[in-house]
Swiss-Prot record:
The protein's name: Immediate-early protein 2
Keywords: Activator, DNA-binding, Host nucleus, Host-virus interaction, Repeat, Transcription, Transcription regulation
One GO MF term attached to the UniProt entry: DNA binding
GO BP, sorted A to Z: regulation of DNA-templated transcription
Source organism of the structure: Human herpesvirus 6B (strain Z29) (HHV-6 variant B)
Length: 1520
């Protein structure tokens, strides 16, 4: 049969021929278009073609009523797939599966990239139903929306970066110009004048329907995107329910189980008795939402005979927006699945045993062995193939949600992957951007595959019970493989054997069997027996269990030894065995991979089990452990925690290489990674993505830490041991693995898995790590976190978990540091990593991470990690970092750790992490941990940390490291990657970047002095009076563009920056506050203040500091200075920290050597230049009035005379005294002075002694001193008097009011009120003759309801146009349009633009505002002088005429201007005609002028040839 694509037909064998198209495309009326003479736009043609070829909506059912497969492309309409409702799935029925939300465009002949490009550019006809309002593009984010479709380069592309869409012309926004420069040539005039935006709907993912299951034709996914491959829809053959021609509303497919009988699958037949338990059976119709490539069709056919587990509809729900899913239904399904599994399990056990034995015999961890095993596995070829198929690449991650699986997890026999499959999977991982995201729920809370009778319970984190979302794995629900590994029902004996049987001989497996049975059964039975386990911790998921699930594909060599019992014991043995193991197993990457997977997976189970089973297992462990070990079994994983380091290395490496493939498969396979969503096992996979690995390891560590706070100490140990093991025991091994991991991670999964994993792991780890970090922190700072630690359960589990987490953290941190060291020296990177990790941990303690930020960070981290540095550096850095971190962590006192670590780490890591590419992943994990630790540490710790950090900041990196480490070191290295993003240590604490972005070197300062003058005041009054220095107010008038100013959030962590930000409502105030650095959420104040002013600010600040002498180099963190420091930073910082980092980087790129960045060099530099910075900052700065005055001068909106001169908000008298300072400015100044920026609380107490403030204020890099009114420094007194003189001094209540949340509009209103009060302007108009009043310092525009111009008489216009065009050249003329600001006029102008732009050779400007200087009357003398000069000739006039200046402020008007140029006279005449038509309609609001340009030329040179050609022909022909 033919499945029709957009431009191609894929031949697919199918029982049903496609019936002809039954649907008309509602979007394009084909009659008009087919008959129109204009050539068809390819998009429209494509649409028509699609309609003609789209598959039939009514496929007759097969006569036998057996289920027939359908491809999504066959579903009713390719253009508009119906919205298949999840509602009509009855809760008791097995869930109806709807076709995938997107129907990928499978082009057999194009690469993914080209197909992607093509599909982006081709019209995907979306139903107008799904279009948001034409003025409100989805999320404002579409590439083409009503505003910018015509001009992809438009600055409105991302409408102001706001997260909420704005209608086009909210209040006085500029009139949008529609640039048709990229329009297809063949759309008709009507189509351009009334474009149908639905065609250009960029992205169905932005669909506003919550349960978007609509299929769209091309989602540019190719043959290999199969993660959503099988969605089961009960396909009704009843024509009533098939989508009818009316697509204007999505029709829901109805489930009619009576009409279609379920074809009983073979497995189903085997398990008929179990199927009775299912409440109802809905038809298992499989609709493939991809167009299978030919080589996959056979697999597909086979799959139809097996039970295919589709992705749960809710699988992706964690991605976010689709929260409307009926989670209760899923709960029920879970329960049902579990119960069915119990019964199913027994039948499959025998097979599993057989398989296990077979694997034990045949298993060699080599690829050839994999093939061999595959050959051994005749019985379930079909199932295996099906599994492979299901493993094909996941569809794009953003898929909203997939239907939940109807089938209870089908029991599949063990599946063996061939090398080609592994390769394919690897490739797929690399390919799909979110390879894991769809498949794997990383959170340890979503252990998906039921393993034993308790399987769900076992893998279900107790916390998950309340969170149905978490219950479903994000990815395809893994069908329960009855691999020995995945089958929860097989005997523990088998599981253990299989797990153990990495390389083991038969005898090994046998030997290990009894012990493993013991352990496995013990753990499993304990699970069953002790329901408490669920409550206490993730059910032990005995290592065996984990192994079972994690190594769902045992073939991949991911046999996990039953690490349950051994994990505790393994902690002890880890060092010993680690060496042996590394020596023993270096050859079997499979083993390593297994170990890593096992260990990662096992971290959770391990910690849990440890909690529950420590005593039991200790006795049991030793024998099996030694047996297994002797047999070269991969038991080292048994010492999951101990070996955790090894596996961590191996995880990073093997996992990255093999696990990326294997884990990918496993994930898809329902491998425990998926089913458990073990962050640990996932971590193994993530390790392939260096960035993610950080997070993952963090999550592992967190999970370990879940159990106990010991993690931090363990982390210390683990890091030490890790460094010991990694360095000493097996350098070559670690090297190989590091290389492998670097390669694999950067290559294979870096992007896809990193994003998915980062998301999943960020979530999972956020939970786990929150717990872990709180506990870890609790250990480190026993006092601060005593609360958190109190929760921790048994000692053994804490030990094991702490060790595992420490190992994971050391691993992650070492890897992160390795990456960082790729840039800085390995030594620097080690510091960086420890710093970064400590910072991450501090961050973790600092605040709960927002989901979005974690996602973003994960994305960034994946990118960064993929960029990861060379192996050597990674190795060295990992060692160094592990050493440093272990040292630091061991050393850190409980108190210092929480405080200093958060502070110092934030500072050091900020410096290092700004460099470290690993930033994001660490951020995710740290964020997760931050949640817990923030909870645990609470405010006291934040205060303490601020103090400690100020202390620590002065100290050497080692001190910082030590202090830092106490925070979960799990994050330590992880955080290294992620740090840059997280700028806040605590939700209350603000962290200072150790990496000073201020102008830090004397050379820089001197250069600035040289360039800017010592006062940085080269503009004197003029700059202050020019609105361009008042932050471009005239161009971005917030009064008319309120969306640019959102309401200020109350500054929570009030650094002086915060209070400033809240107080300095005025544009850039806070922007310049160095602390703004910590509020990386850069709210672009008014479209950003002019760069000049900001640079001046910075320079002045640095200058002032330098001059202060005590503080030669204050870190003026540029980025923060630029941000509107709204210091509820915990939320904002996460999002913008990456941005801030990049800003900082870019800022420093030129000025500083990268070495300066390395924490160490930077620190040394800073230490040399300044005495302990923290001290100098807090004390010297605060205390030296001199400095303060300079500082104030540096701060734009603080009123000092200098400031006033530079950027006065007030009307400056010509004498530059600026004594009439803006009331508002003064108020701001006072607020800034007064706000006690205390550490944890925003106090409105205006008067606070500066000393207290300095002590309290968290930020040690305070560029701006909190100047309280009590301050006696000269500058403040000057300010005080100035305020008195201005007569607008605020009362305290007024100030506190402003300090409280003021909307920008309110702020502007007050400011205007004060200004008006000065000039006694109350209401109404100001006389146009009173220039001083008119040109006061205000941000209001001159408003004109009517244009202050007369219409251009049409006759004159015609004559003027005729004259300009009479010589055959039109480039000496232009048309100027003036128009007022109103919605109606804006619409007219847009229409005019559109009409102009469909003509050739026309250039239209965007509407722009004008800035106006005050008028000035010249006296007779000046005019006489001018006349005299004029008489002397042009040169004299030019040379001798004096410049005249004014001392008022500029104003802008809301009259807008637009210019039109035409390249040829024909176009000029037509443009004039068009413009005049619109000007005549609104003569009082739109005025046209024609102007001639002396020596005019075309706007751009591309028209020159056209103009010349026209002119030559014109002249030639006119002579004829």
């Amino acid at each position: 049969m033919k499945l029709s694509g957009l431009y191609h037909d894929a031949d697919v064998t199918h029982r049903q021929p496609l019936s002809e198209n039954t649907h008309q495309d509602p979007i394009s009326s084909q009659d008009s278009r087919k008959n129109s003479r204009t050539p068809q736009d390819p998009r429209r043609a494509a649409q028509i073609h699609r309609q003609c070829t789209s598959s039939a909506s009514n496929l007759p059912s097969n006569g036998n009523n057996s289920i027939h497969m359908r491809f999504a492309s066959e579903l009713p309409d390719q253009v508009l797939q119906p919205m298949y409702a999840s509602q009509n799935q009855t809760t008791n029925s097995q869930c109806n599966f709807t076709s995938l939300p997107y129907q990928p465009n499978y082009d057999a002949y194009r690469s993914i990239e080209s197909s992607y490009r093509e599909s982006r550019n081709t019209d995907r006809g979306y139903d107008s139903n799904f279009r948001h309002h034409s003025h409100r593009p989805r999320g404002g984010k579409g590439r083409y929306d009503s505003r910018n479709y015509f001009n992809p380069n438009s600055k409105y592309q991302q409408p102001y970066g706001r997260f909420f869409p704005r209608s086009y012309n909210r209040r006085g926004r500029g009139h949008r110009l529609h640039d048709f420069s990229n329009r297809p040539a063949d759309l008709s005039y009507q189509q351009y004048m009334h474009p149908n935006y639905e065609q250009y709907n960029p992205d169905l993912r932005m669909n506003n329907y919550k349960d978007v299951t609509q299929l769209t034709t091309n989602f540019n996914f190719q043959a290999q995107d199969y993660s959503m491959a099988f969605s089961q829809t009960s396909i009704t053959t009843d024509p009533t329910y098939v989508q009818s021609d009316n697509h204007n509303y999505p029709t829901k497919t109805q489930t009619t189980p009576e009409t279609t009988k379920t074809k009983e699958h073979e497995n189903a037949k085997d398990n008929k008795e179990h199927k009775k338990q299912q409440v109802s059976t809905s038809p298992d119709a499989i609709s493939l939402s991809y167009r299978p490539s030919s080589q996959k069709m056979d697999l597909i056919k086979k799959i139809y005979d097996t039970e295919v587990i589709p992705l749960p509809k809710e699988a992706l729900i964690d991605n976010g927006s689709y929260c409307g899913v009926d989670t209760q239904k899923y709960k029920k399904t879970h329960i049902r699945c579990r119960s069915i599994q119990k019964t199913k399990g027994h039948s499959s056990q025998t097979i599993n045993k057989h398989k296990v034995q077979k694997h034990n015999e045949n298993h060699v961890p080599s690829r050839s062995d994999l093939k061999q095993r595959k050959s051994n596995q005749h019985e379930d070829e079909a199932v295996t193939e099906a599994r492979d198929f299901s493993k094909l690449d996941p569809l794009l991650s953003p898929l909203p949600m997939t239907p939940e699986p109807t089938l209870n997890f089908a029991v599949h026999k063990t599946k063996i992957h061939s090398d080609s499959e592994l390769h394919h999977t690897k490739k797929n991982i690399h390919r799909s951007k979110t390879s894991l995201q769809d498949r794997v729920l990383i959170s340890k809370h979503a252990p998906r595959a039921p393993t034993k009778d308790n399987s769900y319970k076992k893998h279900h984190d107790p916390k998950d019970t309340n969170d149905p979302k978490m219950k479903h794995s994000r990815g395809r629900t893994t069908s329960k493989k009855n691999t020995a590994n995945s089958n929860g029902h097989q005997d523990v004996r088998e599981v253990a054997v299989k797990n153990v049987s990495g390389k083991a001989a038969k005898n090994t497996s046998k030997k290990s069997d009894p012990s493993h049975n013991l352990h496995g059964k013990t753990s499993d039975e304990q699970y069953k027996t002790s329901p408490d386990n669920e409550k206490i911790s993730t059910p032990p998921k005995s290592k065996t269990h984990h192994c079972i699930h994690d190594s769902s594909s045992s073939e991949e060599g991911q046999y996990k030894s039953p690490n349950n019992s051994e994990s505790n014991y393994g902690n002890c043995l880890s060092d010993k065995f680690y060496d042996n193991f590394t020596k023993t197993t270096p050859n079997s990457k499979t083993n390593h991979k297994t170990e890593e997977s096992t260990e990662n997976t096992d971290l959770n189970s391990f910690s849990n089990e440890n909690t529950n089973k420590t005593e039991i297992e200790d006795s049991n462990i030793i024998q099996p452990f030694s047996q297994l070990f002797c047999n070269e079994t991969i038991i080292p994983s048994t010492s999951a925690c101990p070996t955790q380091e090894t596996p961590s290395t191996m995880n990073r490496n093997c996992a990255s290489k093999k696990h990326s493939a294997g884990a990918n498969k496993n994930l898809t396979d329902n491998s425990p990674i998926r089913s458990h969503s073990n962050p640990s096992s996932f971590t193994a996979f993530n390790k392939s993505n260096s960035g993610n690995s950080t997070m993952n390891s963090t999550s592992n560590g967190d999970e370990c830490t879940d159990k106990k706070p010991n993690c931090s100490s363990t982390e210390n140990k683990s890091e030490t041991s890790n460094q010991t093991n990694g360095e000493n025991s097996d350098k070559p091994l670690s090297k190989t693995f590091t290389e492998v991991s670097d390669r694999a991670s950067s290559r294979a999964s870096s992007r896809a898995s990193s994003r998915a994993s980062s998301r999943a792991s960020s979530r999972a780890s956020s939970r786990a790590s929150s717990r872990a970090s709180s506990r870890t922190s609790s250990r480190a700072s026993s006092r601060a976190f005593s609360r958190a630690s109190s929760r921790v359960s048994s000692r053994a589990s804490s030990r094991a978990s702490s060790r595992a987490s420490s190992r994971a953290s050391s691993r992650a941190s070492s890897r992160a540091s390795g990456r960082a060291s790729g840039r800085a020296s390995s030594r620097a990177s080690s510091r960086v990593s420890s710093r970064a990790s400590s910072r991450a941990s501090s961050r973790a303690s600092s605040r709960a991470s927002s989901r979005a930020s974690s996602r973003a960070s994960s994305r960034v981290s994946s990118k960064a990690s993929s960029r990861a540095s060379s192996r050597a550096s990674s190795r060295a850095s990992s060692r160094a970092s592990s050493r440093a971190s272990s040292r630091a962590s061991s050393r850190a006192s409980s108190r210092a750790s929480s405080r200093a670590s958060s502070r110092a780490s934030s500072r050091a890591s900020s410096r290092a992490s700004s460099r470290a590419s690993s930033r994001a992943s660490s951020r995710a994990s740290s964020r997760a941990s931050s949640r817990a630790s923030s909870r645990a540490s609470g405010r006291a710790s934040s205060k303490a940390s601020s103090r400690a950090s100020s202390r620590a900041s002065g100290k050497t990196p080692n001190n910082k490291l030590m202090s830092n480490i106490p925070s979960p070191q799990t994050y330590e290295k992880t955080s290294n990657k992620r740090k840059p993003r997280q700028i806040y240590c605590d939700s209350n604490k603000r962290q200072i970047y150790p990496h000073d972005t201020s102008i830090s070197t004397e050379a820089e300062v001197s250069e600035i002095k040289f360039r800017c003058g010592p006062e940085l005041n080269f503009y004197k009054n003029a700059a202050a009076r020019l609105q361009s220095f008042n932050h471009n107010d005239q161009f971005y008038n917030p009064r008319f563009r309120p969306h640019i100013r959102t309401n200020r959030k109350k500054s929570e962590s009030t650094n002086y920056t915060d209070s400033e930000s809240s107080t300095s409502r005025s544009r850039s105030h806070s922007r310049y506050s160095p602390d703004s650095l910590n509020t990386p959420k850069r709210k672009k104040h008014k479209s950003g203040s002019s760069s000049i002013s900001s640079s001046i600010e910075e320079n002045s600040r640095s200058n002032s500091r330098t001059e202060t002498g005590t503080d030669k180099l204050i870190t003026f963190n540029y980025q923060h200075s630029r941000t509107r420091s709204s210091s509820s930073s915990s939320v904002s910082s996460s999002c913008s920290s990456s941005r801030s980092k990049s800003w900082r980087k870019s800022r420093y790129k030129n000025s500083e050597d990268p070495a300066t960045y390395s924490p160490r060099s930077r620190l040394q530099q800073l230490e040399k230049q300044t005495r302990p910075k923290s001290a100098s900052r807090d004390k010297t700065k605060i205390k030296s009035p001199n400095h303060e005055s300079k500082h104030r001068h540096a701060d734009m909106f603080r009123n000092s005379q200098k400031t006033g001169e530079k950027f006065p908000l007030d009307n400056s008298s010509p004498s530059n005294t600026h004594e009439q300072s803006n009331h508002l400015e003064n108020a701001i100044d006072q607020e800034q002075k007064k706000t006690p920026k205390t550490t944890n609380t925003t106090t409105n107490t205006i008067y606070r002694p500066r000393d207290n403030q300095s002590n309290i204020s968290r930020n040690t890099t305070k560029c701006k001193k909190k100047r309280t009114r009590d301050d006696d420094s000269d500058s403040s007194m000057q300010n005080f008097f100035k305020k008195r003189i201005s007569g607008t001094q605020k009362t305290d209540s007024e100030i506190s009011e402003i300090e409280e949340e003021l909307s920008y509009r309110e702020y502007v209103r007050r400011k205007e009120k004060k200004e008006s009060a000065k000039y006694k302007i109350h209401r109404g108009r100001v006389s146009t003759k009173d220039f001083r009043k008119l040109f006061r310092n205000t941000i209001r525009a001159f408003e004109y309801k009517q244009i202050p111009k007369k219409p251009f008489p049409e006759n004159k216009l015609k004559e003027a146009v005729y004259n300009i065009c009479s010589n055959g050249c039109s480039n000496t003329g232009a048309i100027i349009m003036y128009f007022t600001r109103s919605k109606q006029v804006a619409e007219i102008i847009k229409t005019m633009q559109r009409e102009l732009m469909i003509r050739p050779n026309i250039t239209v400007s965007e509407p722009f505002k004008m800035n106006h200087a005050p008028p000035n009357y010249y006296d007779k003398d000046a005019i006489n002088q001018f006349i005299e000069l004029q008489k002397q000739g042009p040169q004299e006039l030019w040379d001798k005429l004096e410049n005249n200046t004014h001392d008022l402020f500029t104003r802008h008007s809301d009259v807008k201007t637009l210019m039109v140029y035409a390249a040829t006279p024909i176009d000029f005449v037509m443009a004039s005609k068009i413009c005049n038509k619109y000007a005549k309609d609104k003569p009082k609001e739109i005025v046209l002028r024609v102007c001639s340009i002396i020596d005019g030329d075309n706007s751009i040179s591309i028209y020159n040839s056209v103009s010349r050609d026209f002119k030559s022909k014109y002249l030639t022909l006119s002579k004829c």
